[in-house]
């Protein structure tokens, strides 16, 4: 089963240019035993645009991100990154593709035994071996400044708040200058003020970097703030994809109920 309700009108905002989509997912299916998680999902996002993927817990939102970044393999369907289907690629080829993508895990996933600076430098150590120590330090400082975490280089993850950990995770995700940024519940577990600050930071990065963003979230308020388009998932399918205004106009009962409860 594919998309149930499709919005034909596309936003004439960022990402609606002559460039090909950064990410195209077509008829993606994924099951774990008898549990069908994704059942024919099709989505796309252009360079410079942001797609927010919404839905209740267990609808496959995070699984979708793991498939896009190549951490899991779909049962069927295709995932094209800048026109190249990554399904079935060899590990070394997938490694090269993954360098073009940044990923922020739901819980920031910082290394507890490393300082903030060491966490942000981690991608450089493993993927930019020719970079000198001074270059690495300068780049780490620039990235931390970009996410508003100046002066935190020597702190441990346990020394900073959840919102700050998300910022450091974002800095690390940006280290290799990705063309695509995947964010898994970037405001989960944060208070409203911290959530708003993360949303503001995402908007800032959108403006400055013009990447393609895919954001998985439960937070409808944040989603409509940061995203050009929203996709609502249920039972492994896209129920509706469009602008927030499109969702408000939709007469599907599930969509109405989701908006009411969010």
Regions of interest found by a model, annotated:
Residues 69:
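Helix-to-loop junction immediately C-terminal to a conserved catalytic motif
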Residues 84-85, 133-152, 203:
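Conserved ABC ATPase "signature" region
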Residues 114-122:
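Short coil-to-helix segment of the ABC ATPase nucleotide-binding domain corresponding to the Q-loop/switch region
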Residues 156-160, 164:
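Conserved ABC ATPase signature
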Residues 175-179:
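A short, proline-enriched helix->beta-strand linker immediately N-terminal to the Walker B motif
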Residues 181-184:
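Catalytic Walker B motif of ABC-type/P-loop ATPase nucleotide-binding domains
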């Amino acid at each position: 089963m594919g998309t149930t309700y499709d919005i034909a009108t596309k936003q004439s905002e960022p990402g609606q240019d002559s460039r090909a989509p950064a990410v195209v997912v077509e008829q993606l299916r994924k099951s774990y035993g008898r549990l069908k998680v994704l059942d024919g999902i099709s989505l796309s996002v252009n360079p410079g645009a942001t797609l927010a993927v919404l839905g209740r817990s267990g609808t496959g939102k995070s699984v979708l991100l793991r498939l896009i970044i190549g951490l899991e393999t779909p049962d069927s369907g295709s995932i094209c990154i800048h026109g190249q289907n990554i399904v079935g690629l060899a590990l070394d080829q997938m490694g090269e593709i993954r360098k073009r993508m940044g990923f922020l895990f739901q819980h920031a996933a910082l290394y507890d035994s490393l300082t903030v600076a060491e966490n942000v430098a981690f991608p450089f150590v493993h993927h930019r071996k020719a970079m000198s120590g001074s270059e690495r330090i300068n780049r780490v400082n620039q990235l931390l400044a970009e996410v508003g975490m100046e002066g935190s280089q020597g702190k441990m993850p346990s020394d900073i708040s959840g919102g700050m950990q998300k910022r450091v995770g974002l800095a690390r995700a940006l280290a290799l200058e990705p063309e695509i940024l995947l964010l898994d519940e970037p405001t989960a577990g944060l208070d409203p003020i911290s959530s708003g600050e993360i949303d503001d930071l995402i908007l800032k990065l959108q403006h400055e970097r013009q990447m393609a963003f895919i954001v998985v979230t439960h937070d409808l308020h944040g989603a409509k703030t940061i995203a050009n388009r929203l996709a609502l998932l249920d039972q492994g399918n896209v129920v509706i994809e469009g602008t927030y205004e499109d969702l408000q106009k939709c007469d599907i009962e599930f969509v109405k109920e989701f908006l009411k409860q969010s």
